Amino acid sequence: MRRAVSTRLAVTAALLLVSAARRAEAAQQCHPLAGSVWRNPGLMAGVRIDAAGYRNTSYLGDYQGIAPTLGFNHPKFAAMALLPAYRLARNGRTGYGLGDLALALRVPVPSFANRSLSAGFGLAATLPTGKSDADLGMGHVMLMPEFWFNHDRERVQLVGTVGFARALTSAGASHHNHGPRPIVNPMNLSEIDASLNGFLRVHAKVWLKLGAFGAAPVGNVNVQGMTRVIVGSGVLVTVRGLELSAELQAPLTGAPFTARGVLQVGYRFELKRRRRGAAPAHASHH
């Protein structure tokens, strides 16, 4: 498979806004969802925009993507959905279309937690809504279970993950043995991955981010597996419910792209939990 950034990394970047740096509200960044979720349930609606240039043995070009995101955080779980649309240029020819739908669920494990540490398990999946013959989708379902942790020390947060990804298809039935498929967010048919992100608060509303992601093929299902390592740095800004994230990513190995920029904007709606024994809101009208 082409040396490219994985779908898991794309989901990770997009979902930072589900729980962007808000220590005051007890929310943390995680991969791909919130680790220590909000004290109160909340809904996050946003949009992710990314742009990258790439070069491989078959194609030279660039792509731009826009993806609406919807996330829900609860003290017992966090969930999200993301559906990208792309403009993709391949050797001077331009195409447009949807990418693969991404879904994710994360659950914290109370026995793993203390005052500064939270951890748990998650499961992400992509569904083949993008056309594989247009290099916009994988053409099959991909499942991505993971273990995650979040360590919070006042102005510094560390977020890490260890995961596994497996396509629900065989090598012969997939497009992975024909070169770069898809260009926008390919993965090995079977791989292990890990990520580590650090966040430093430099202002009450501003955090700086530095992170790395790596993945390596495992098993004999991969016809042309490829190891890749990607680093990124960026900034997170929060103003009340509005959250803004900007990041620049570059490959160390695997050459997924020459460079990629990611911009995310979202708004968080915190939902107050109803007190036990309280009457329903409509009761006073009777």
Indicate residue ranges for each PLM-predicted region.
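N-terminal export signals
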Residues: A13-L15
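Bacterial N-terminal signal peptides that target proteins for export
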Residues: M1-V11
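Transmembrane beta-barrel domains of Gram-negative outer membranes and organellar outer membranes
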Residues: A26-H286
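C-terminal segment of classical bacterial N-terminal signal peptides
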Residues: L17-A24
